[in-house]
Regions:
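Acidic-basic catalytic patches of nuclease active cores, encompassing PD-(D/E)XK
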Residues: 1-36
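Domain-level recognition of nuclease-like catalytic cores that cleave nucleotide substrates
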Residues: 95-141
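Active-site beta-strand-loop-beta-strand hairpin of nuclease catalytic cores
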Residues: 46-61
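Catalytic phosphate/metal-binding cores of nucleic-acid and nucleotide-processing enzymes, i.e., regions
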Residues: 18-25, 29, 41-43, 69-70, ...
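Acidic-and-aromatic substrate-binding clefts and catalytic sites of carbohydrate-active enzymes
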Residues: 37-41, 103-105
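Short, well-structured alpha-helical interface segments that form or flank functional binding sites
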Residues: 12, 43, 76-80
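Flexible, charged surface loops at secondary-structure boundaries
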Residues: 41, 49-51, 88-91
């Protein structure tokens, strides 16, 4: 797959996650919504935010490498998303939603691996795993 395909696939994944949350929470969601974070406040664009500002979601459509290794740079980007979410008020439900991708060598998904190795950084950010083939979401941890 060419690198030019990745942004399109990421956008499709983001839309599917948005639809899942709308169907399962009965709320309206906005894609790429800016919210103020930090002090002094500066706008940051979050992938998906509930219209009533109660839920914020960052989507990560990452897979294992071709040789079934951890995509370590992408895990760093996921930590960055958690960092931004952590600046939102505690009134928000905060999620990182990852694509379900199974490593048969390790017998674990990338979201399971991420949670296992980074749960000490998560605070009140929840990790979820979305399977677009089955339209199923699973809370990790």
């Amino acid at each position: 797959m060419s690198n030019s395909e990745h942004p399109r696939l990421g956008a499709v994944f983001q839309k599917r996650v948005k639809q899942w949350f709308e169907e399962n929470t009965k709320k309206e969601f906005i894609i790429e919504k800016k919210l103020p974070i930090g002090n002094p406040p500066k706008d940051h664009k979050f992938d998906i935010v509930a219209a009533d500002d109660t839920i914020a979601i960052e989507c990560k459509r990452y897979t294992w490498t071709e040789t079934w290794n951890v995509p370590s740079a992408k895990m760093g980007t996921t930590n960055e998303a958690v960092f931004y979410l952590s600046f939102l008020p505690d009134t928000y439900e905060k999620y990182v939603v990852m694509l379900k991708t199974v490593n048969k060598k390790r017998n674990e998904t990338l979201a399971e691996y991420y949670y296992k190795t980074n749960r000490h950084l998560l605070g009140n950010v929840k990790v979820m795993e979305y399977d677009p083939e089955l339209d199923m979401m699973r809370l990790i941890g």
